[in-house]
Swiss-Prot record:
Record-level Gene Ontology MF annotations: ATP binding; pantothenate kinase activity
Alphabetical list of Gene3D superfamilies matching this protein: 3.30.420.40
Annotated protein name in UniProt: Type III pantothenate kinase
Active site residues per record: 105 (proton acceptor)
Organism encoding this protein: Burkholderia cenocepacia (strain HI2424)
Lineage summary: Bacteria, Pseudomonadati, Pseudomonadota, Betaproteobacteria, Burkholderiales
Recorded superkingdom: Bacteria
Positions contributing to ATP binding: 9-16, 129
EC numbers for this chain: 2.7.1.33
Enzyme class: transferase
Subcellular location: Cytoplasm
Primary localization: cytoplasm
Amino acid sequence: MSEPHLLIDAGNSRIKWALADARRSLVDTGAFGHTRDGGADPDWSHLPRPRGAWISNVAGADVAARLDALLDARWPGLPRTTIRARPVQCGVTNGYTTPEQLGSDRWAGLIGAHAAFPGEHLLIATFGTATTLEALRADGRFTGGLIAPGWALMMRALGTHTAQLPTLTTDIASGLLAGAQAEPFQIDTPRSLSAGCLYAQAGLIERAWRDLVAAWQAPVRLVLAGGAADDVARALTVAHTRHDALILSGLALIAADAAPATAQD
């Protein structure tokens, strides 16, 4: 029986992981913080030894060192690969002028999306610390993207750089807007700030989607991912699809594609 692959997505806010079997199915998943202060270490005690770890890390050197320590403690000597964007991989062609400048998380997400929705033009919107958009043609060509502050970052910037506006988290804002989003305008400052930043996210997505449909003269599936996707989705007026594992699914494909070359590991 083929050994599984351990997949790790180290984002700007937290670290997600999954174990992928020979069919590239995610059979076990979890999440943990950048530091032990952010939550307990992952419980990998029940997992079999994987063939190797495949890592997307956009969180920096300290997180890379934490991951190395965790992997060495559980599986000493485990091979590991930190992925980078390439010009071409797993059926996706990178349209960046300098392909390696594309974030590894966005690259893995593109690969995951191309496999999840074959033969379709896609606009992929991912809501994390930053909101990112990727335009992906049905033939696998990534033609470019957009990066904007995420919902939480927008609200935090207003709270930090003004004298009278509150600093709100997404949890607080989501609670404030529960049941209130049917109203286009809000009647107090916290809700006005929450809804204004949320509508800024939705407006960006809808404008980008409409521009892409017009440019390509073809249907484009809007795919949402990331922690704030549910909140933004409620503010959208266009059809969309939710997918919560694009990056991990893309990592599974990258690992499987490289497996023959690392069969001796």
